[in-house]
């Protein structure tokens, strides 16, 4: 590990205190030229002892503005201290979590996974138009049918056609011959440049796509492409202690990755992350942002520096081995659940190394779905699946209660058939 290590509470406090001392403090400076200030102290008062002992809350109240991308542009006169935390965080994620080589990466903390995915699509659309002189109608987004709806938001906002690739009902995998025929047809109608959204843990199934499947077929047809991996759910679990992982930066075909701190990492909402290889993010530079010292290449404008600090603190609290232990605990709970489902001969889908179990609809009645807040694939009578997500709060006692109800329902259900 190059950047990721476990910190004590005192070490974290000292590091963040030092960062805040290098960050603009509106109380002790004559700052009158920017439209910003600290949080309103009639509501966000900082004189409680618990605030003084919380590096995150002190950062939140000091209110650093992390506008821009600080791995790309090193301007840091106003908020340089917490900028440094975000820079370190991006390199930690790219190299120590996502298995990048000893190189630099670009990235920033977004408002969520949706923004990170749209940032990627924006970067690659502009890359193809600027670097390859592509016509707008020659560019397409391509992704699996199980992909998060943010891909469709990006398609709409960027006015790029999107191609949806069907998946097998049971394996949730893209079939090579299906993808081949779809790409061939797209080429025949004039598509030459492809933005791939490849999944590392889909929202409904936790399924993982093979980026190399896309790469091999595009290479076969001599087509240009950029692969973005949506790891909003799977990014903090699937690559951990997983030698089979092909969806990270160890794969030369992967250009960028989305992560989301507010899911597996249990960070506050607003802690998505976009990480990319160098020499890509400059394609979204907004030259008109002339009054900003930083070069503005991000979809977000102003954003809270406390979100970057929150993500860094969670990772630093555990360290790589503490995090591995936590992830393996959730995997073991998931394996226990799957064993019970196997014993009951209930059909389900689960991706290796993931903590989502998706059960076929026929084995779940309305009462069970409502009692455990099981999420359907669609909220209408055509629904085929319900999902279970084994998060930190989902202990074996809860899973055992679910198993009891499933066993009771399916025993009665089978008798009636």
Swiss-Prot record:
InterPro entries: GrpII_AminoAcid_Decarb, PyrdxlP-dep_de-COase, PyrdxlP-dep_Trfase, PyrdxlP-dep_Trfase_major. Signal peptide: none annotated. Its main location: cytoplasm. Its EC number is 4.1.1.105. Its cofactor is pyridoxal 5'-phosphate. It catalyses: L-tryptophan + H(+) = tryptamine + CO2. Pfam families: Pyridoxal_deC. PANTHER family: PTHR42735, SPHINGOSINE-1-PHOSPHATE LYASE 1. Catalyzes the decarboxylation of tryptophan to tryptamine. Tryptamine is a neurotransmitter that induces the release of serotonin, which is suggested to modulate gastrointestinal motility. Therefore, the tryptophan decarboxylase from the gut bacteria Clostridium sporogenes (strain ATCC 15579) may influence host brain and behavior. Has weak activity with tyrosine. Activity against phenylalanine is undetectable. Belongs to the group II decarboxylase family. This is Tryptophan decarboxylase. It comes from Clostridium sporogenes (strain ATCC 15579).
């Amino acid at each position: 590990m190059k950047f990721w290590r476990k910190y004590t509470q005192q070490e974290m406090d000292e590091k963040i205190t030092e960062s805040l001392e290098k960050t603009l403090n509106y109380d002790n400076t004559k700052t009158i030229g920017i439209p910003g200030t600290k949080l309103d102290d009639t509501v966000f008062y900082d004189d409680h002892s618990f605030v003084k002992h919380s590096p995150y809350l002190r950062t939140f109240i000091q209110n650093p503005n992390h506008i821009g991308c600080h791995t790309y542009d090193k301007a840091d006169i106003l908020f340089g201290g917490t900028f440094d935390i975000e820079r370190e965080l991006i390199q930690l994620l790219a190299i120590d979590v996502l298995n990048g080589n000893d190189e630099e990466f670009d990235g920033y903390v977004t408002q969520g996974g949706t923004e990170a995915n749209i940032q990627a699509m924006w970067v690659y659309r502009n890359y193809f138009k600027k670097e390859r002189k592509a016509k707008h109608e020659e560019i397409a987004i391509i992704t699996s049918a199980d992909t998060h709806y943010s891909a469709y938001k990006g398609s709409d906002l960027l006015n790029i056609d999107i191609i949806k690739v069907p998946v097998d009902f049971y394996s949730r995998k893209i079939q090579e011959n299906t993808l081949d025929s779809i790409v061939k047809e797209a080429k025949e109608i004039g598509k030459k440049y492809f933005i791939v959204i490849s999944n590392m843990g889909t929202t409904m199934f936790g399924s993982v796509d093979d980026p190399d499947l896309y790469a091999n077929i595009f290479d076969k047809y001599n087509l240009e492409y950029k692969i973005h991996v949506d790891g909003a759910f799977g990014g903090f679990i699937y690559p951990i202690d997983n030698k089979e992982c092909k969806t990270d930066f160890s794969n030369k075909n992967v250009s960028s990755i989305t992560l989301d701190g507010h899911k597996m990492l249990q960070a506050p909402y607003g802690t998505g992350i976009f990480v990319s290889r160098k020499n890509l993010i400059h394609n979204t530079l907004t030259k008109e942002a002339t009054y900003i010292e930083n070069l503005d290449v991000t979809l977000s404008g102003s954003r809270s520096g406390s979100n970057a600090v929150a993500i860094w603190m969670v990772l630093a609290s555990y360290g790589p081995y503490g995090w591995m232990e936590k992830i393996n605990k959730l995997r073991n709970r998931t394996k226990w659940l799957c064993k019970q489902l196997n014993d009951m001969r209930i059909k389900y889908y689960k991706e290796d190394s993931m903590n989502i179990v998706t059960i076929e609809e026929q084995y779940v009645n309305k009462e069970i779905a409502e009692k455990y807040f099981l999420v359907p694939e669609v909220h209408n009578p055509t629904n085929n699946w319900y999902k279970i997500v084994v998060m930190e709060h989902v202990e074996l006692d809860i899973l055992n209660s679910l198993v009891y109800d499933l066993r009771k329902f399916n025993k009665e259900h089978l008798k009636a058939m």
